[in-house]
Amino acid sequence: MKKVDVKESAVGRETRIRKQWNEQSIFEQSIQNREGAQSFVFYEGPPTANGLPHVGHALGRTIKDVVARYKTMVGYKVLRKAGWDTHGLPVELGVEKQLGISGKHEIEEYGIEPFIQKCKESVFTYEKQWREFTESIGYWVDMDDPYVTLENPYIESVWHILGTIHEKGLLYKGHRVSPYCPSCQTSLSSHEVAQGYKTVKDLSATVKFEVKDSENEYFLGWTTTPWTLPANVALAVHPNMEYVKAKQEGHVYIVAKERVQDVLKEDYEVLSVHKGEELVNTSYMPPFPMKEVTNGYHVIAADFVTADSGTGLVHIAPAYGEDDYRVVQSEGLSFLHVVDEKGEYTEAVPFLKGKFVKDCDVDIVRYLAKEGLLYHKEKYEHSYPHCWRCDSPLLYYAGESWLIRTTAIKDTFLQNNDSVTWYPDHMKHGRFGKFLENMVDWNISRNRYWGTPLNVWECESCDHQFAPKSIADLRKHSTKETPEDLELHKPYVDEVQVCCEKCGGTMTRTPEVIDVWFDSGSMPFAQYHYPFENKELFEEQFPADVIAEGIDQTRGWFYSLLAVSALYTGKAPYKRVLSLGHVLDEEGQKMSKSKGNALDPVDLVEKFGADALRWALLVDSAPWNAKRFSERTVLEAKSKFVDTLINVYSFYVLYANLDEYNPHETYDVKRTKLDEWVLSRLHSTTKKVRTALDDYQFTNAAREIAALVDEVSNWYVRRSRNRFWESGMNAEKAAAYETLHEVLVTISKLIAPFTPFVAEDIHVNLTGNSVHLEDYPVVNESLLQPKLEAEMNAVLQVVELGRSNRNQHSLKVKQPLAELVLLEHNENDMDWESYRDIVMDELNVKTFHVELDETKYTSYQLKLNFKKAGPKFGKNVNAVNGWLKQLSQAEVQNFVSTERAVYEVASGEEVVVTAEDVMVEKVAKSGFSNTTNGQYTVMLDTNVTEELLQEGVAREFIRAVQEYRKQLNLPVNLRVDVILDTEEELQQTLTNHKELLKENLLVKQFTFGHLTNEDDELSLGETKVRIKLSSAN
């Protein structure tokens, strides 16, 4: 076995391992070895390569890699196809910035074709960084044969899906109000909008709408979007709600009865009460009269009006609200549009023409105040949608869009979701399920350039539509020969004209591209160019057994996958969804570059290694929980887990090489109870880890492994060191080597999905084989010994209590103590005699015994809990307190047992004192200190005699010399002669313990003499010791 370089950096080790993997094609072999096995399917959510990875990507890639590696090791064939999301507005915006242009007008001036080419060139700007990041973090995914959403085969599959949806009558062109980004100048779908809500404070206004032909009488309407008021065409009331006419300061106001107090506040007189339906058709004077409104400016009835907020009257601007649009359509009212595609007022509002509407709320309110039409204004905090791509506030515009009738198959969506297992479970019928319940038809079209062209051709003569499902289908209907290498992007497909089969007229393609979420939602099919190729492969790889992405994909990719599959096949595209929580900074704030609190995962890997980063992300908390994260978290994972494991592995290799131990040879072995215990722990942990991983409980699995590694390092190896240090090879020493070898090899397999680099390093060095080509460990039931594990756990508890006891009294473990007494509080069949030597050695005590009668070593004190007892006993509280203090120990013991006592106060009244009235404090016998965990109490004799003190000094000297040997890098088996120069008192102490020193320090001869300043010096508290070592071999 190669010597372990414990000083090798994590990134150095991982680079070396990656090189091995590449040279030996380990990733490819891991898949080939499962050829013919049952498939386990996961889908890679496609990132965009025009932005750099962040810590959230590290979490997602870690989880997916753990799943894929684990499932491979338990026998499945797991294909791992990478993907790239290459279309969409972020790409266009990046190119605009690069070219120094902005907006559609300048794009079209620049030229659509060159612009599209620039987009194509830019999408892989950071591909190299993504590939390096993916490899450095140990995520095994096929990046040499990815699916790419801009490629013709992918787009052709998307066209087949859209053509099928059109064929089903579910794709239609409609005029409706949709969320619109004036900055990007395109509409958005409802699931895109759901990703971008922010809490903002906007100026709200309560507006006076003067009743026509009535003096000083006004309807009061409240709005949080004053900018929509110039487009007002009606006021809406609920027909069954009660409204009042109330007089205030000479004016009469009409407002919902339930809202009058909140709106008018005070000093008003209710004149009359009316049903909403009585107010219908009442005309009013609009604050911004428009001659285009030939049917409007009167009250209408609408069921969506409530009295939850505002005035109970809703101002209706049909161009900018979904409910408004619907009710105006049904009422046949005029339609008014006063805003252009850039979100600026048109000449319809002359005094604000060319201004961005969201910046004009103050101007509108000032105008209303000037005209005497403002009743009240205030800042109003509410949730408002923003563009998920550019962060601009959205507007709601009425316009023509292509929509998919998702509402027509809503039941299919809901049924498919019911078949899915969600992690966490509450997402299923919570965040995701509620979104499905409230779905609207999917606005699929975007008035942009760089995207999958919507494959619908419309006849200029008869409006007939044709939706080709393939390139061949398009060629077949084309009016002229199309190029063999036709690229399925604007402007190339726009040049293809089709002959209308209905009237013989010319059909041209509708100019829109599609929602990029439809692109990525089509990947189960399009990644294999289905249905044109790979039908068997597709059927083998559909649906996914699991997908895993960030929680922000709930209304993104998770939804689009479900929607596309339901529309196309009627089936759910996945069986399980792992919805991963946000990775926050250590203060619980969302990470962002602008705040300066973002962690770069590439930097973290460089500093601490990928294993440490992966382990930190997994062991901290369940991946679907939001987690606070920092460099400290990763450093802790490295030191507590990765480095601990490497130290154990290094220890084994060092001594096995010294003893020329060969795990492939047969030795006479005699396993100790400690060996049996660690093997039982190994296999019980294996059982728990497999159960956890089968249920995707990664954190539970990681914590089980962490506990095992800690116990192997800090208990098994430490308790076995003397066996490894013995000269020669006896049966117990061979058993220690055999056991630790088995433990390390099995642990390397257990951790292979979690920390693949250190797992590989250990396994290759100990066995010669890649751990990633091995099967996952299975439980050997014959090695499980629950009783032994329980007993050793009890020993560990007692040792931990003893250490805590020593710490409380600043007594180092190197300082021997005379006695340890163990008090047991629960009956059990623990055979402490079998573990006497371990406890005594671990806690460095001369005697140890178990005591059942705790009164020999402890007494109790009762103190009144005044917070509880004061109100209960009132004026008698001080008398009760005095009585408690003078109780005998027998009476105190009785109270502790019964938790009840009766005391007669001076007045003759009896008061009952119970456990909740009293605080019970356990006091150790004089000269002893105690620590307890409820099950055990450890009593230590803290009196240190001169003899014990001297032995403690000798043991502290042993520690100092062992540390000194490490600093000199002396071989661990090198025997030395020691010359010491120190004061006489310390010389005598060390002489008295010469055999103890020789036994622990591999010393052949101790002498005392004069050493010069050139020799090294050790410190033992205040005492200095000069020392010189020389080889005695």
Curated annotation (Swiss-Prot):
Q: Does the keyword Zinc-finger apply?
A: no
Entry keywords, A to Z:
Aminoacyl-tRNA synthetase, ATP-binding, Cytoplasm, Ligase, Metal-binding, Nucleotide-binding, Protein biosynthesis, Zinc
Q: Where is the motif ('KMSKS' region)?
A: 590-594
Name the Gene Ontology biological process terms: isoleucyl-tRNA aminoacylation
What domain of life does the native source organism fall in?
Answer: Bacteria
The coenzyme or cofactor needed here is: Zn(2+)
Catalytic reaction annotation: tRNA(Ile) + L-isoleucine + ATP = L-isoleucyl-tRNA(Ile) + AMP + diphosphate
Note whether Cytoplasm occurs among the keywords: yes
Subcellular location(s): the record lists: Cytoplasm
Pfam families associated with the record? Anticodon_1 (PF08264), DUF5915 (PF19302), tRNA-synt_1 (PF00133)
Q: Which family does it belong to?
A: Belongs to the class-I aminoacyl-tRNA synthetase family. IleS type 2 subfamily.
Q: Could you give the subunit structure recorded for this chain?
A: Monomer.
Protein purpose: Catalyzes the attachment of isoleucine to tRNA(Ile). As IleRS can inadvertently accommodate and process structurally similar amino acids such as valine, to avoid such errors it has two additional distinct tRNA(Ile)-dependent editing activities. One activity is designated as 'pretransfer' editing and involves the hydrolysis of activated Val-AMP. The other activity is designated 'posttransfer' editing and involves deacylation of mischarged Val-tRNA(Ile).
Q: What domain notes does the record hold?
A: IleRS has two distinct active sites: one for aminoacylation and one for editing. The misactivated valine is translocated from the active site to the editing site, which sterically excludes the correctly activated isoleucine. The single editing site contains two valyl binding pockets, one specific for each substrate (Val-AMP or Val-tRNA(Ile)).
For this entry, the protein name equals Isoleucine--tRNA ligase
**What organism does the record attribute this protein to?**
Bacillus thuringiensis (strain Al Hakam)
As recorded in Swiss-Prot or TrEMBL, the protein's gene is named ileS
